[in-house]
């Protein structure tokens, strides 16, 4: 099913009376100029047409800087949004606010790979993107036939940045980031006269964590709530216990087992009627005999250990000897290296269909992630060409597809208690209890080890 059709099914019932609004200036504004504590936000707008979901749509593409200020009026952060709005404007259309994850990831991945009006043409069968040029094609599966789109790059991602005197701790953190993104959303609604339009949030990977936090910020019971119609979670990570295989935390081994089975099936290491069949077998084994065996620890009887080890080998394609040496607990990093070691290959973390070759085949973990270096050059070229050459955005800043500064300085605390794993799933439940019409859509990938799909299923149940 096309992405636009999926989204249409989520928001089909959203009809509302729209309030009158002021006219919005459409002229380009100059590039940002940071002098004497003042910044003039840059705005670049182009009118375009495309066919999406079988419909011909005229739309306005706008890259704009939003300046966030301190309490005393000094600029602290410049956040870039890229919006695609149907022309002429129709305030009855939903507005879909989108962001990627990281923390530190720019919106290029969702914008140029999924929902935007253009997509970069790179192989979809897990082959390397190779050398330029990388064609930028019309995206018939964009959501522009059913919704207006706003891609947000938080500080430290994309072209967005903190001013030189801003303390990173004020923006680089779970709650600080959500507050900033929510503020940008409110300002965009102000500037575009869209307060009474249906509103959706969508995030990928850590962006799903951000979605939960921003939803809490917007609908948090402050008596100034922004009502939301839906949340779209892509490659969901809400409970981080499932991705931290620290000693004593057995959950990580349980929730990644179905991913291992899917990857082993794809690469011909296990036999099954289909990937769906092997995944379902792995699900049932993971929450049954496997979880029980891990929790028994040293009390696990030899016969039970042997039975679990044999089934684990059948599902993962790893040898019983290797599984015994790992005490039945194989981390994802080791799995990437071990699954295809006999072929001299490693597999990807973001997408286990990708394979790569390391300098040292005898190593314990991979040198790098072939599913990332297999696509990043194409996406980087696409977003820079689109923003600078097509939309005319002017900046000397490098586009941060994956910015390092946010991750280095990130504050992960939510006040849930010292030593607790981060879990934002309760905030989605809270948002749904406070808004009876809020709907949530979850999309996962069988081959995505960064955000194990079984972990997301567990979090949302």
Q: PLM ranges: what are they?
A:
Residues 117-122, 215, 219-316:
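A catalytic-pocket lid/entrance helix-loop region that shapes and gates access to the active site
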Residues 193-206:
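Alpha/beta-hydrolase fold nucleophile elbow
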Residues 297-450:
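Alpha/beta-hydrolase fold catalytic core
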Residues 203-216:
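Glycine-rich nucleophile elbow surrounding the catalytic serine of serine-hydrolase chemistry
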Residues 65, 120-194, 241-256, 263-273, ...:
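Active-site-proximal cap/loop segments of hydrolase catalytic domains
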Residues 213-214, 325-328, 438, 452-461:
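Short alpha-helix in the alpha/beta-hydrolase fold that links the catalytic acid
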Residues 8-19:
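Bacterial N-terminal signal peptides
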Residues 27-32, 73-170:
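N-terminal cap/lid subdomain of alpha/beta-hydrolase-fold enzymes
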């Amino acid at each position: 099913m096309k992405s636009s059709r999926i989204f249409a099914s989520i928001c089909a019932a959203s009809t509302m009376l729209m309030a009158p609004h002021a006219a919005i200036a459409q002229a380009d504004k100059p590039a940002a100029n940071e002098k004497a504590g003042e910044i003039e936000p840059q705005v670049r707008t182009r009118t375009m047409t495309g066919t999406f979901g079988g419909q011909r749509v005229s739309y306005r593409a706008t890259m704009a800087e939003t300046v966030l200020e301190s309490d005393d009026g000094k600029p602290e952060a410049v956040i870039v949004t890229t919006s695609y709005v149907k022309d002429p404007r129709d305030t009855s259309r939903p507005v879909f606010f989108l962001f990627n994850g990281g923390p530190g990831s720019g919106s290029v991945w969702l914008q140029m790979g999924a929902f935007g009006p253009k997509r970069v043409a790179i192989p979809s069968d897990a082959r390397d993107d190779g050398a330029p040029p990388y064609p930028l094609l019309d995206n018939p599966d964009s959501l522009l036939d059913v919704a207006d789109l706003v891609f947000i790059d938080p500080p430290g991602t994309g072209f967005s940045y903190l001013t030189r005197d801003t303390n990173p701790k004020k923006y680089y953190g779970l709650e600080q980031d959500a507050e900033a993104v929510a503020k940008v959303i409110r300002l965009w609604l102000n500037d575009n006269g869209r307060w009474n339009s249906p509103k959706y949030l969508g995030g990928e990977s850590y962006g799903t964590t951000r979605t939960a936090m921003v939803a809490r910020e917007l609908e948090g019971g402050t008596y100034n709530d922004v009502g939301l119609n839906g949340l779209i979670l892509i490659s969901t990570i809400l409970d981080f216990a499932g991705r931290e295989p620290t000693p004593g935390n057995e959950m990580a081994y349980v929730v990644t087992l179905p991913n291992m089975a899917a990857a082993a099936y794809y690469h011909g290491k296990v036999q099954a009627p289909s990937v769906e069949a092997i995944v379902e077998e792995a699900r049932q084994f993971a929450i049954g005999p496997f979880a029980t065996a891990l929790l028994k620890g040293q009390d696990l009887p030899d016969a039970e250990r042997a039975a679990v080890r044999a089934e684990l080998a059948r599902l993962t394609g790893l040898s019983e000897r290797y599984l015994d040496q790992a005490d039945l607990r194989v981390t994802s990093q080791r799995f990437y290296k071990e699954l295809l070691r006999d072929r001299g290959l490693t597999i990807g973390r973001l997408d286990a269909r990708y394979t790569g070759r390391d300098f040292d085949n005898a190593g314990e973990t991979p040198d790098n992630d072939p599913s990332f270096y297999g696509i990043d050059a194409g996406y980087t070229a696409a977003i820079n060409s689109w923003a600078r050459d097509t939309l005319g955005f002017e900046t000397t800043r490098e586009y941060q597809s994956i910015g390092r500064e946010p991750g280095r300085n990130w504050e992960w605390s939510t006040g849930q208690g010292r030593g607790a794993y981060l879990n934002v799933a309760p905030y989605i439940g809270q948002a749904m209890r406070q808004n009876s019409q809020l709907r949530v859509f979850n999309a996962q990938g069988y081959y995505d080890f960064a955000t194990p799909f079984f972990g997301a299923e567990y979090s949302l149940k």
